[in-house]
Amino acid sequence: MNLRGYSYRLVKANKAADSKHIGVKLGRYCITNDIPVIQIAQQFSVSRMTVYNWFSGIVMPHKATVAQIEKLLSK
C-alpha cells in the first residue's frame, strides 16, 4: 500500500475506526487507491477537515452525501 499523501496517524486512525462507517470505508478506499483528500473534498463540496473526520470515523456524512459515497465505492 502506497501511503503517499497520507500520514501514518491518519492511516492508523482509519484502521482503528469502525469499518461499518461509510466515511471509514471511503477512507480505506482512498488510502488504498491513493486518491487525494482534496479531490474527495472538492467532489463532495466539503472541507478537507470534514473528509479527514469521515476517514477517522469521527463524523458521519449527511444522508445525501452517503448515497454519493456509496455510488463511488460501488465502481
PLM region descriptions:
Residues 7-33:
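A short, Lys/Arg-rich alpha-helix, primarily the initiator
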Residues 63-75:
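DNA major-groove recognition helix of helix-turn-helix/homeodomain DNA-binding modules
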Residues 39-41:
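Short alpha-helical "recognition helix" segments of helix-turn-helix
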Residues 26, 37, 66:
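Helix-turn-helix DNA-binding elements, focusing on the entry/boundary residues of the two helices
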Residues 1-6:
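Intrinsically disordered, low-complexity and often Lys/Arg-enriched segments
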Residues 46-60:
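Recognition helix of helix-turn-helix/homeodomain-like DNA-binding domains
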Residues 18-22, 46, 64:
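Alpha-helix N-cap/N′ positions at the starts of helices
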